[in-house]
């Protein structure tokens, strides 16, 4: 009988998607041992099977979620399923745009794939972790793998510098999280997030407030929110571009998933305090991210500051604290997956053919490569929130949810900074489509001849076409995607309890 109870409480089926990722890690390491030629052939196949199986198992869990597993340390509820699906899909697209870049850099493909899958495993586990210990293990799995990926180009001093900066700042963030967790454990005598939330309701104190600040600092680091953003531009510029593409979506999504869970459970009784702090972070992120992006000359640094601003937009939905607000945040992260990875696909293709990352070198690109020009233009317009792109509908839902919850300052700042972002996005587009051939950059004038064949498309082009199609069809896809996001929020028990309490108070 005790064994049966123990088995029921484990509910190991909750981590079947992560088990497929773990098998993929083992498989890629084994083929890497067999030699580079074998790894180049089989590592991508293993990754596709692993991630595809994980996505299928997540889809099957949607109608039968597991709300408590491993003695309450992990939840596979619908919200966790939605975030884990975004992360798994972002990894799949990131790997599609990585193979050619990795081969050209002379790096071992099997080893690279194993580290990316390890980061994915940590990110997915973080989305469902409901215990301080499981959160820390997931967080460090994601972080350590991310440090390795940032410094993967060993011969490039910029990559090593990026990895060192990321390691130092990430280690500080981990230490701050542990310090805050020790306070929470001392106040409650438990490591379970929900239990801690119940125990500290009647124990408001300076220590509790301090633990909230420490935990929020860790969250802000993971989502690259101001003022915890300093690592982002340097790490984005120095890291391999496919790694930047993955970190910009996968790591940020995991950070937001963790933020929603811990703020809605552990700190639900400190609703006003954390919303005030999040409001400040959102305003600073939207303002600084989009204003500083105006002055950038590197495409990757521009996208880095853009990602800081995008984090601020997502925070509008979280601060609103309503079902529509949280659903809008999930929807925008799904939209961000396609428009951001689509932009990075174009940046990678351009850098592979020219070796350049400077924005001015894109001048006149439409003359030599109309497809990259079209794809990058659509993705940048979507990031700016122009209709009828997917990003427009994502921002509209966020702004409506914020306005309905009386978050007027956040919405106004969001609208103003969106206009600012449109300016620097359109500046890049204008540069690519200059009218006179003599205005093209020297890099573009020596651009290699391109032959785009539909048959036998390499993985990078498949990723590019997919992202462009989803981004451009925003008007058609926004409603079904919002319904899925709304379902993820409405069918998650802990969120419904919090929303019910909030509605009663209002």
Swiss-Prot record:
E.C. number: 7.1.1.-
Coiled coil, from the record: none
Membrane topology: Multi-pass membrane protein
InterPro entries attached to this UniProt entry: NADH-Q_OxRdtase_suN/2, ND/Mrp_TM
UniProt KW keywords: Membrane, NAD, NADP, Plastoquinone, Quinone, Thylakoid, Translocase, Transmembrane, Transmembrane helix, Transport
Biological process terms in GO annotation: ATP synthesis coupled electron transport; photosynthesis, light reaction
Transmembrane segments: 14-34, 42-62, 79-99, 108-128, 132-152, 167-187, 206-226, 240-260, 276-296, 302-322, 330-350, 374-394, 409-429, 462-482
Record-level GO cellular component terms: plasma membrane-derived thylakoid membrane
Subcellular location: Cellular thylakoid membrane
Enzymatic class: translocase
Domain of life the protein comes from: Bacteria
Catalytically driven reaction(s): a plastoquinone + NADH + (n+1) H(+)(in) = a plastoquinol + NAD(+) + n H(+)(out); a plastoquinone + NADPH + (n+1) H(+)(in) = a plastoquinol + NADP(+) + n H(+)(out)
GO molecular function, one term: NADH dehydrogenase (ubiquinone) activity
HAMAP family the record matches: NDH1_NuoN_1
UniProt family annotation: Belongs to the complex I subunit 2 family.
PANTHER family: NADH DEHYDROGENASE
Function of the molecule: NDH-1 shuttles electrons from an unknown electron donor, via FMN and iron-sulfur (Fe-S) centers, to quinones in the respiratory and/or the photosynthetic chain. The immediate electron acceptor for the enzyme in this species is believed to be plastoquinone. Couples the redox reaction to proton translocation, and thus conserves the redox energy in a proton gradient. Cyanobacterial NDH-1 also plays a role in inorganic carbon-concentration.
Subunit field text: NDH-1 can be composed of about 15 different subunits; different subcomplexes with different compositions have been identified which probably have different functions.
Name of this chain's protein: NAD(P)H-quinone oxidoreductase subunit 2
Organism (species): Prochlorococcus marinus subsp. pastoris (strain CCMP1986 / NIES-2087 / MED4)
């Amino acid at each position: 009988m005790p064994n049966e109870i123990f088995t029921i409480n484990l509910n190991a089926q909750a981590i079947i998607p992560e088990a497929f990722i773990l098998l993929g890690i083992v498989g890629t390491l084994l083929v890497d041992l067999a030699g580079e030629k074998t790894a180049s052939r089989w590592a991508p196949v293993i990754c596709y099977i692993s991630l595809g199986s994980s996505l299928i198992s997540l889809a099957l869990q949607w109608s039968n979620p597991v709300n408590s597993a491993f003695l309450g340390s992990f939840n596979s509820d619908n919200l966790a399923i939605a975030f884990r699906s975004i992360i798994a899909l972002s990894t799949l697209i990131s790997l599609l745009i990585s193979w050619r870049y990795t081969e050209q850099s002379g790096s071992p493909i099997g080893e690279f794939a194993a580290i990316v899958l390890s980061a994915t495993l940590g990110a997915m586990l973080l989305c469902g972790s409901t215990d301080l210990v499981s959160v820390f293990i997931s967080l460090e799995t994601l972080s350590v793998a991310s440090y390795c990926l940032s410094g993967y180009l060993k011969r490039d001093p910029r990559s090593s510098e990026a990895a060192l900066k990321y390691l130092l700042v990430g280690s500080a963030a981990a230490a701050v999280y542990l310090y805050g967790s020790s306070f929470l454990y001392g106040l409650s005598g438990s490591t379970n997030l929900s239990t801690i939330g119940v125990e500290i309701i009647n124990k408001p104190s300076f220590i509790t407030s301090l633990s909230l600040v420490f935990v929020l600092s860790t969250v802000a680091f993971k989502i690259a929110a101001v003022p915890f953003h300093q690592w982002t531009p340097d790490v984005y510029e120095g890291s391999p571009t496919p790694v930047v593409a993955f970190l910009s979506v996968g790591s940020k999504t995991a950070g937001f998933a963790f933020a929603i869970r811990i703020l809605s459970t552990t700190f639900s009784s400190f609703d006003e305090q954390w919303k005030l702090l999040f409001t400040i972070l959102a305003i600073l992120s939207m303002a600084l991210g989009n204003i500083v992006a105006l002055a950038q000359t590197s495409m990757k640094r521009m996208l880095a500051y853009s990602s800081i601003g995008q984090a601020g937009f997502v925070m509008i939905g979280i601060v609103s604290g309503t079902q529509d607000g949280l659903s809008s945040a999930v929807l925008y992260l799904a939209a961000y997956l396609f428009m951001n990875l689509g932009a990075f696909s174009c940046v990678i293709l351009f850098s592979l053919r020219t070796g350049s990352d400077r924005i001015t070198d894109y001048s006149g690109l439409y003359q030599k490569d109309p497809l990259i020009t079209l794809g990058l233009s659509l993705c940048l317009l979507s990031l700016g929130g122009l209709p009828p792109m997917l990003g427009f509908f994502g921002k509209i839902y966020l702004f409506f949810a914020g306005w309905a919850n009386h978050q007027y300052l956040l919405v106004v700042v969001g609208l103003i900074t969106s206009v600012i972002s449109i300016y620097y996005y359109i500046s890049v587009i204008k540069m690519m489509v200059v009218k006179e051939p003599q205005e093209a950059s020297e890099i573009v004038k020596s651009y290699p001849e391109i032959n785009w064949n539909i048959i036998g498309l390499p993985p990078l082009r498949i990723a590019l076409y997919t992202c462009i199609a989803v981004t451009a069809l925003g008007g058609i896809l926004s409603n079904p995607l919002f319904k899925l996001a709304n379902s993820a929020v409405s069918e998650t028990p802990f969120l419904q309890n919090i929303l019910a309490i909030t509605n009663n108070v209002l």
